Amino acid sequence: MEGSVCVDGAAAPAPDEASLIEGVSNAVLLVLVLSVTLLAGLTTLLCRSEQQRIHPESQERVRVVREQLQAEQVSSESRHQFYSDMSCPVCLQQAVLPVETNCGHLFCGSCIIAYWRYGTWLGAISCPICRQMVTLLFPLFQDSEQSAVAADSPVEPTLILTDISDYNRRFSGQPRSLLDRLRDVPTLLRHAFREMFSVGGLFWMFRVRILLCVCGALAYLVSPLDFLPEGVLGLLGFLDDFFVILLLFIYISIMYREVVTQRLAG
């Protein structure tokens, strides 16, 4: 009788006390939590441009600039609306000569320049929406649109482009934290790839550098030699692949910012 009890006790599997959830290993739980966190962070970065509400700390300054612009400009009925899906949160009208900040928010060219001039010319402004430091302004209007806009608007496109170039020349090279670099990645990547596949956009050396970086990242992803091999660590082995992709995006955004800075300096 005692022998059978011993046999039954030896046959019973020992419970896995190290696992937080029965039947699911801790490695799988860790990868799941990290993946959800990474996806949530990327979704937040990509959707930041959808938020167009003025930050409470910038409301008073925006109100003064809005009143100043309304006093200087003609009535809104005479403003030609080229962009049906883009509005400026400063003047509360359709964006004329639209400009995008490095944090991904859209303003009229004259509005963001007036917002800069109302404060101080000695330092970079903070975005009226997210309060991130604005170190780059991207004009979203083309040369072919300037004459049509100038016919119906008192704003001179050439002066706006000059002010934008002056702003970028002053503040595009300012040091930024790692968090600010991550926040800039979606906007800079979008502009970099847009210029990369356009005629007369980025010069060929920069395009070759991007292609080499992409090829290097792809070679690492398909290579069986990993810092964290999937065959040994399971799902944890994909963490280094996510890290390589993230570094690739950050490096391309840094290269594109350097190209924009050199273009302004030249």
Swiss-Prot record:
Observed effect of gene inactivation: Morpholino knockdown of RNF170 results in developmental defects visible by 48 hpf, including microphthalmia, microcephaly, and loss of motility. Neurogenesis in the cranium is remarkably reduced, specifically in the mid-hindbrain region.
EC number: 2.3.2.27
A GO molecular function held by the record: zinc ion binding
Domain of life (superkingdom): Eukaryota
GO cellular component: endoplasmic reticulum membrane
Keywords assigned: Endoplasmic reticulum, Membrane, Metal-binding, Transferase, Transmembrane, Transmembrane helix, Ubl conjugation pathway, Zinc, Zinc-finger
Membrane topology recorded in Swiss-Prot or TrEMBL: Multi-pass membrane protein
Main location group: endoplasmic reticulum
Transmembrane regions: 27-47, 210-230, 232-252
Zinc finger region(s), RING-type: 88-131
Catalysed reaction, written as an equation: S-ubiquitinyl-[E2 ubiquitin-conjugating enzyme]-L-cysteine + [acceptor protein]-L-lysine = [E2 ubiquitin-conjugating enzyme]-L-cysteine + N(6)-ubiquitinyl-[acceptor protein]-L-lysine
PROSITE patterns attached to this UniProt entry: ZF_RING_1, ZF_RING_2
Cellular compartment(s): Endoplasmic reticulum membrane
Cytoplasmic side: 48-209, 253-266
Job of this protein: E3 ubiquitin-protein ligase that plays an essential role in stimulus-induced inositol 1,4,5-trisphosphate receptor (ITPR) ubiquitination and degradation via the endoplasmic reticulum-associated degradation (ERAD) pathway. Also involved in ITPR turnover in resting cells.
Protein name: E3 ubiquitin-protein ligase RNF170
Gene that specifies this protein: rnf170
